[in-house]
């Protein structure tokens, strides 16, 4: 774990403003206090950075809607009934780093109290190039607030880092210890980061994503290795809901289908399947261009649907799409159906 002094030195070197170092120097948490550490950190963040004023401005720009509702809608783009929660922080240019951190702590606090009977896993993804210099600052605050270290994987090394030992990380300290492991990664990528494979002992859903532009491609070998590792942990009788996301149906999807067929032949895949073809970019021009050049060829759609025809699309599939693309500006969207199979094709951009 990085130290407070090393973070302050790095912040000074990056010339990001003295208030961040000043905050770390004044931050105090008392484990004997009636107020949980997470609330202590939130309160000090709010005071030191005058977040009350910022939230008021944020509310004013959004028709005076309650800030807690706005923030929830803004960030909580993964909300399904599985034992897994992803807090994806696409740091907004409208919000400061401290307010983003405050909200993540608030979300962790809410999830922990509302799901007391569940072992929760948290994945924190910082997906904006502007936040790289603040990564250690964020990790340190979360460590102080919840007693768990957030792990940092450098851009391009994600597939190699997903090894079985990764799922054995334990919470350091008593905070939220009864909630189960709290793990996370702080990526060094930019706003084009999409989704990555998240699998663990308790989850009912596995997400597979590729984004070649940021070198976060999950290789076929890694994909199969992790699925096998997952089944070894939970047993082959456990039902999995598989949400398969890819941004390249023509080539990569074909490889994934081959691997799924292998797993199915081994009787290791007893899941519902849902397919989303996404093409997300950071500007409207590229997104509009992708609307024309990207597409799922008819023969590929038939192959996918034929492979998946015995599986049922999750009832909340459309809801999942809404959650995932809620912050995207959609330029093109098309939906294909064949039996119970639902294939979404989306092109858009992040503002």
Swiss-Prot record:
Keywords, alphabetical: Cytoplasm, Glycolysis
InterPro entries referenced in this protein's UniProt entry, alphabetically: PpPFK_gamma, PpPFK_gamma_sf
Domain of life, per lineage: Eukaryota
GO-annotated cellular components: cytoplasm
Pathway listed: Carbohydrate degradation; glycolysis; D-glyceraldehyde 3-phosphate and glycerone phosphate from D-glucose: step 3/4
Principal localisation: cytoplasm
Swiss-Prot/TrEMBL GO biological process terms: glycolytic process
Protein's job: Structural subunit of pyrophosphate--fructose 6-phosphate 1-phosphotransferase. Not required for catalytic activity. Fine-tunes allosteric regulation of the ATP-PFK by ATP, fructose 2,6-bisphosphate and AMP.
Quaternary structure annotation from Swiss-Prot or TrEMBL: Heterododecamer of 4 alpha, 4 beta and 4 gamma chains. The gamma chain bridges the N-terminal halves of the alpha and beta subunits.
Miscellaneous section: This subunit is only found in some Pichia species.
Record-given protein name: ATP-dependent 6-phosphofructokinase subunit gamma
Organism the protein comes from: Komagataella pastoris
Gene: PFK3
